[in-house]
Amino acid sequence: RIADYRLSPAEDKVLFRLDGKPLYRRSAYSSYVVYDTELGEAAPLHESDSLRYAVFSPDGERVAFVLRNNIYVKELATGRETAVTTDGVPNHIINGMPDWVYEEEWGLEDALRWSPDGEKLAFLRFDESGVRDYSLDLYGPDGSTPEDDVTAPRYPRRFTYKYPMAGEANSAVSLHVYDLASGRTTHVDVGPERDQYLPFFGWTPAGALCFYRINRLQNHLEVFVDDLKGTRKMIYEERSDKYIDNIGMGTVTFLSDGD
């Protein structure tokens, strides 16, 4: 059953996400299918049914997707796949997808952005190794049997995930840019502070990278634009003696000339 779909920019392809296994409030493990509207043909994006996210490149010729906490790029014409990251490990390193905090509290559904020219990928990397585990007992069907099946599990199952209590360590989050032509990944300088949030990032029309930085107390917000050539400029700053509301955060719009 189709859960969601995305059209390519030229609307000649459709990326279908099929029903999968829920993870958190907004995320799931799913299968994806690419449908070519001109040929009338459909093909799986990947053989796995555990993809976390997939998105067309700006020209519609590639798809970036996240599988097992790593990012891949697939050329649709040839089927060739390139690994953007290789260090992803469950409950340790997440690439291209938010951890629980960023999904639940900041509303991020993904952590991966194509550049306007389709030649670069910006992504967040979450190091959860310092975050303590939290476990819940889950009752009811686990998805392996129909809900009305008498053989469905009657005992609770244990679900364990990384959950930082108040005052405990959050994930260490870093921002990176992958260049498809060179295959090189660049670490973006977001400042020396470890205990902070990067709740929004994206590209300007001119190809510079914009990102928000806010401290853990959430009362000091800074917005930067980095041209990825050595120049970073703060374009907005806000302070509060209480806290800064995150409603509407990330709804920045750049003019077409990028200025």
Residue ranges: model-predicted function:
Residues 1-259:
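Beta-propeller folds
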